[in-house]
UniProtKB/Swiss-Prot annotation:
Higher taxonomy: Bacteria, Bacillati, Bacillota, Bacilli, Lactobacillales
Protein name: Carbamate kinase
UniProt entry keywords in alphabetical sequence: Arginine metabolism, ATP-binding, Cytoplasm, Kinase, Nucleotide-binding, Transferase
Pathway annotation: Metabolic intermediate metabolism; carbamoyl phosphate degradation; CO(2) and NH(3) from carbamoyl phosphate: step 1/1
EC primary class: transferase
UniProt cross-references to Gene3D superfamilies, sorted A to Z: Acetylglutamate kinase-like
Catalytic activity: hydrogencarbonate + NH4(+) + ATP = carbamoyl phosphate + ADP + H2O + H(+)
Family as reported in the entry's similarity comment: Belongs to the carbamate kinase family.
Biological source species: Oenococcus oeni
Annotated compartments: Cytoplasm
Length: 313
């Protein structure tokens, strides 16, 4: 089944390990590119999306520490675009090198992507997405003097973290550009970190203080470009029920209805596996094709043996 249009969503944590240096992240992405090129070898049309959770948190911390009246910190939408550019550069450089090594006549290109959200989304009244580092309570009081608009919540006894809105994506502004790149034998890298969050004001798109979940944004892109397959990569080869319990069970071929029942049983952790499963359900329900949740190292096994968690109607 070659020549399929396949969106592959990479997690931000797959890019950043314990070493947050640019060199270490580039090295990690070179290994990622070696795994992804197997899809290209099978004559599939690859579209890469990625997270930026650790990276944008680190960048916002740098911005805050260095902020002055004459050189103020950049807002979240701009920080997201900055990480889209940096991670996209690393990813396309790694992909181009691997494609060259394999003798494949293709190249990669990064698209800084604006993802539209609804200005009336209830998420704007209920910030819930944690970003950045953990703080002690006394540190929060100092930060609030400089940024009274920031909202911090306690996170499971580990300290306090800033939370921001995480609205659902309703459109990907550049999806036609991305489709055009695919049609011209280019591997697009887009929707980095869920894309730059924008809201519509009349005929204009305006950046907003939010972070869009990259799995939902990847699904919206896959839907708009009429992808045949959405692959959401995570740390494990399969989705599990009763995860990390003696009776844990991996899911291999599963229907949307079965997954929805598992969601009702609270089988999937919020902020971890749950959004991946929900994004996969959305894609399949929209009649686009199948969705797969698996790990990067399992890509070859998925291609050859169909292993991983495969979601169908």
């Amino acid at each position: 089944m070659a020549n399929r249009k396949i969106v592959v969503a990479l997690g931000g944590n797959a890019i950043l390990s314990k070493d947050a240096s640019a060199e270490a992240q580039q090295a990690a992405l070179r290994e990622t590119a070696k795994s992804l090129v197997s899809l290209v070898k099978e004559n599939e049309k690859l579209i890469i999306t990625h997270g930026n959770g650790p990276q944008v948190g680190n960048l916002l911390l740098q911005q805050m520490i260095g902020s002055t009246k004459s050189n103020p910190a950049m807002p979240i939408d701009t920080a997201v675009s900055m990480t889209e550019g940096s991670i996209g550069y690393w990813m396309q450089n790694a992909m181009d090198d691997v494609l060259e090594d394999e003798g494949i006549d293709k190249s990669a290109a990064t698209v800084v992507t604006q993802v539209e959200v609804d200005a009336n989304d209830s998420a704007f009244q209920n910030p819930s997405k944690p970003i950045g580092p953990f703080y002690e309570k006394e540190d929060i009081n100092k930060i609030r003097e400089l940024h009274p608009e920031y909202i911090y919540v306690e996170d499971a006894g580990r300290g306090y973290r800033r939370v921001v809105p995480s609205p659902k994506p309703v459109n990907v502004r550049e999806y036609q550009v991305i489709n055009s790149l695919v049609d011209n034998n280019v591997i697009p890298i887009s929707v980095g970190g869920g894309g730059v969050p924008v809201v519509r004001e009349g005929n204009h798109l305006i950046g907003c203080e939010a972070v869009i979940d990259k799995d939902f944004a990847s699904e919206k892109l896959a839907e708009l470009i009429k992808a045949d397959l959405l692959i959401i990569l995570t740390a494990v080869d399969n989705v599990y029920i009763n995860f990390n319990k003696p009776d844990q069970k991996k899911l291999e071929n599963v229907t949307v209805e079965e997954l929805e029942n598992y969601i009702n049983e609270n089988q999937f952790a919020k902020g971890s596996m749950l959004p991946k499963v929900q994004a996969a359900i959305n894609f399949v329900n929209n009649g686009c094709g199948e969705a797969v949740v698996t790990s990067l190292k399992n890509i070859n096994n998925f291609l050859q043996k169909g292993s991983g968690t495969i979601i169908t109607k």
